[in-house]
């Protein structure tokens, strides 16, 4: 058997390429999903990178993606790898502008964590801060654009978005003072 025949018969090679071309992914997630050894995954990633079939971005995570994706889409994917940022984005996509305290209650994340996520999303110009006395509310600037990016970068979330239901806390939580 020639080397070419061996390569084409290897299911890991095609699986890795198809997975990366269908949606961006991290190296470790790719190893987990493909159920191939990490050395094998690394080998085929190197081959696909040399052939310019895929691209990668190294940062906190090693992100592998299709060359068809725009840098802004990869930047958004990298942002939503953070669970708190992802929770805030999904809640704000599904709702009207909310205050920080409402986001804390809905997402069940800590106040400092929500604060960091909001600061990051404001800096990236994904959300807008509305100043309303006595508090501010936050909303997504362009929901349709953000949702189209979500469809390209995280199709599982996008396809199941209608099933995602917000469990709003009772308004009394924000109004009562506990002794």
Predicted segments with their positions:
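A generic structural signal for beta-strand entry/edge sites
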Residues: 24, 61, 135-137
């Amino acid at each position: 058997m020639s080397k070419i025949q061996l390569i084409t018969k290897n299911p890991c090679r095609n699986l890795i390429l198809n997975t990366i071309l269908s949606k961006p992914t991290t190296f470790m997630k790719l190893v987990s999903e493909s159920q191939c050894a990490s050395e094998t995954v690394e080998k085929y990633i190197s081959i696909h990178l040399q052939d310019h079939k895929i691209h990668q971005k190294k940062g906190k995570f090693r992100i592998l993606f299709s060359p068809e994706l725009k840098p802004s889409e990869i930047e958004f994917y990298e942002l939503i790898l953070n669970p708190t940022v992802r929770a805030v984005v999904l809640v704000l996509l599904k709702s009207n502008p909310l205050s920080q305290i409402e986001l804390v209650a809905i997402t069940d994340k800590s106040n400092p964590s929500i604060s960091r996520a909001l600061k990051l999303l404001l800096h990236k110009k994904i959300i807008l801060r509305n100043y309303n006395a006595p508090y501010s509310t936050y909303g997504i600037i362009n929901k349709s654009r953000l949702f189209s990016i979500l469809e390209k970068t995280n199709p599982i979330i996008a396809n199941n978005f209608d099933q995602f239901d917000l469990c709003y806390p009772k308004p009394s939580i924000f109004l009562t003072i506990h002794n």
